[in-house]
Amino acid sequence: MSQDLNQDANSVAAWIASLLKQRGIDRIFGLQGGHIQPIWDCLGKQGTRIIDVRDEGAAVHMAHAHSELTGQLGVAMVTAGPGVTNCVTAMANAALARTPVLLIGGCTSRPQANMGPLQDIPHTEILAPICRYSRTARVAEQVIREFDEAIARAFGDLGEPGPVYIEIPTDVLRTSVKKTLIPKDWMIPKLIRKLYPDPELIEQAVHLIRQSKRPLVITGRGGKNARYELTRFLDTVDAVYLDTQESRGLIDRNNKAFVGAMRAAAMNGADLVITVGRKLDYQLGFGSPAVFPEAKFLRLADSTGELIDNRRGDVEVLANVKTSLNALSDVLNMNAGERDSN
């Protein structure tokens, strides 16, 4: 155990601060508290910008906004007990928005667990239903591995992106861990595993597109990183395009496919609806035949949550969205102008 944390470059708190810096985190939003003070000290020492708030929920909302605007991980840090519970609404919002947010919380020391210590609340159980990852990191030598896994989950490794939560007992934060016990690969970003589209499904999707006369493309959060691929696909398909709140600004409003008004008419008149990383929720009439009376559905997404909802797709492609859009454009461009007659 280190007696002077500020002099121990190998404390768990110092390792956490170093990891965040190596992952490109230049600012953290939060409200100071005793349970997390060791991390704050290390962050300040290394020059990370700390944005102080007056309510913990605001810290998570700000981290959420930062992630939305930059594409980076948003990080918030709060103390134990009410510090964490004040974040529940903001974390639920990040979960529904599928935004990468890391919330770091404090918790009581291991020797005092279940003895009635200050602000001892089951944070991980409270947050688990709305987080991709919710853990207490109790083993000092494994804390950085836990952070590595949590951040990968936040960015959608093996599932949807979304908020994650990690808490570290106060005694663990002050524990010194030798450099030889921290593998280098824990400190660098994981390569997010990519799903590739089934060629048979791509062929079926192309058949649907060639049959259609009035295709409509609707994007959501799952398509937000595919600007180039989506623009190319729209040019290839010659479809009408609708954005949603989740994908506003993805496509230039001057693009010939863009429809800013008469959106209801566009949905009502489509004979093929192509959803790109978009759930059929209340904003899209739940995919109801009353809204889309003549449409078949082609669903593209990299997570099941954006495929399995209120309307089954005639063709569903569960794969990386960029790769799927490029695959469709490639096949369609092989025989430009060809359409099945029906």
Predicted regions and their residues:
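N-terminal alpha/beta PP-like core and its mobile active-site loop of ThDP/TPP-dependent enzymes
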Residues: 2-340
